[in-house]
């Protein structure tokens, strides 16, 4: 009897790493693989991954950026402990292949995989590669990127996506039956985006009620009460929610999206084919959100507006002066920029390396 092959997926810290990792993990499981997940205790991945049915393997490690001199001084000891714990996981799980999708946890896991002679596959989600993936790409057997040129020897395949984003109707079909006010979706992410929560209600208040878009605004749990107060103060009606369960459908139903520019958000919007105003988080590491947004904006698939330039007046003018037909054009251009087979490409590489 042939035993199923085993993969150790490594991704952590943010949804931008975790959800592409889940897409790959689910694809491998569908092909008959056993999948274990290397992460850190008390993290986002520790809450999201186990309910999906994957064995969670915790090790103690976190980033050092902005943590102060004391944390930096202890880095060698913390790294040594993380290496030891990761080595124990690799020896116990005995994966046929190790797949890293970003986050600090992938560094000790990836290095110990190489030490143990395990094939290593790396995928970089952002247009500006993170430090960990820059290092691991030098020792990996296969390297993939979501954006062209992010890693020197990386093959551009796009971002691993959940199937819901690749199964939406094309923009022409979605826009064909639409009429009336524009449908505006504002997405702040799991933590919310205070700048969007403050400015969007003010912008909508500047638009005459009869021309105002129909608005759905997602804020994150911590900011939902403040968001309700902002809309009430502006005298604007909107559907307000802390989370969106079906993001793919929400993207598809919107005429225009206002959002941050994390890698997953940008590539999911492109896969669906939707027009967006991207407002990059100004404190993102290496300003990678600006580079992510520029990928679509430069192709005519959306607008790039820096947070320092975002004002209620400018946003109101854009919303009033943009017709649905123009948004369809941008949605179509966004759609042409996204590769949708990254999940399959990464899974194929795993199988080729273990054939």
Swiss-Prot record:
Topology term for the membrane = Peripheral membrane protein
Question: Where, subcellularly, is it found?
Answer: Cell inner membrane
Instruction: State the pathway, as annotated in the record.
Output: Cell wall biogenesis; peptidoglycan biosynthesis
Q: Which GO terms describe its molecular function?
A: UDP-N-acetyl-D-glucosamine:N-acetylmuramoyl-L-alanyl-D-glutamyl-meso-2,6-diaminopimelyl-D-alanyl-D-alanine-diphosphoundecaprenol 4-beta-N-acetylglucosaminlytransferase activity; undecaprenyldiphospho-muramoylpentapeptide beta-N-acetylglucosaminyltransferase activity
Q: What class of enzyme is it?
A: transferase
Q: Name one GO biological process term.
A: cell wall organization
The cross-references to InterPro entries, in alphabetical order and at most eight, read: GlcNAc_MurG (IPR006009), Glyco_trans_28_C (IPR007235), GlycoTrans_28_N (IPR004276)
| Protein name according to UniProt | UDP-N-acetylglucosamine--N-acetylmuramyl-(pentapeptide) pyrophosphoryl-undecaprenol N-acetylglucosamine transferase
Q: Which organism is it from?
A: Paracidovorax citrulli (strain AAC00-1)
């Amino acid at each position: 009897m042939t035993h199923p092959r085993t993969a150790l997926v490594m991704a952590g810290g943010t949804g931008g790493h975790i959800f592409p990792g889940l897409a790959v993990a689910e694809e491998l499981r569908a092909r008959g693989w056993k999948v274990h997940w290397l992460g850190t205790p008390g993290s986002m991945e520790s809450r999201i991954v186990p309910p999906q049915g994957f064995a969670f393997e915790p090790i103690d490690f976190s980033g050092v950026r902005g943590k102060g001199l004391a944390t930096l001084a202890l880095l060698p000891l913390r790294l040594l402990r993380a290496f030891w714990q990761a080595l124990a996981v690799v020896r116990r799980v005995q994966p046929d292949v190790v797949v890293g999708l970003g986050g600090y946890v992938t560094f000790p896991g990836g290095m110990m995989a190489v030490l143990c002679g395990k094939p290593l596959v790396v995928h970089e989600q952002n247009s500006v590669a993170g430090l960990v993936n820059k290092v691991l790409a030098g020792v990996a057997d296969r390297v993939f990127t979501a954006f062209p040129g992010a890693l020197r020897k990386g093959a551009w395949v796009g971002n691993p996506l959940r199937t819901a984003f690749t199964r939406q109707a094309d923009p022409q079909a979605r826009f064909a039956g639409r009429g009336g006010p524009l449908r505006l979706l504002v997405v702040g992410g799991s933590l919310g985006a205070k700048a969007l929560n403050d400015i969007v209600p003010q912008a909508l208040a500047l638009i005459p009620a009869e021309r105002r878009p129909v608005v759905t605004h997602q804020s994150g749990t911590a900011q939902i009460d403040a968001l309700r107060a902002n809309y009430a103060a502006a005298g604007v009606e909107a559907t307000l929610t802390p989370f969106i369960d079906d993001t793919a459908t929400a993207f598809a139903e919107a005429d225009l999206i206002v959002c941050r520019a994390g890698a997953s958000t940008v590539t999911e919007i492109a896969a669906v084919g939707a027009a967006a105003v991207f407002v990059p988080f100004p404190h993102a590491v290496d300003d990678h959100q600006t580079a992510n947004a520029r990928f679509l904006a430069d192709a005519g698939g959306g607008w790039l507006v820096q947070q320092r330039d975002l004002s209620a007046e400018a946003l109101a003018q854009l919303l009033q002066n943009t017709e649905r037909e123009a948004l369809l054009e941008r949605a179509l251009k966004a759609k042409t920029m996204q590769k949708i087979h990254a999940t399959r490409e990464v899974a194929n590489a795993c199988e080729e390396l273990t054939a």
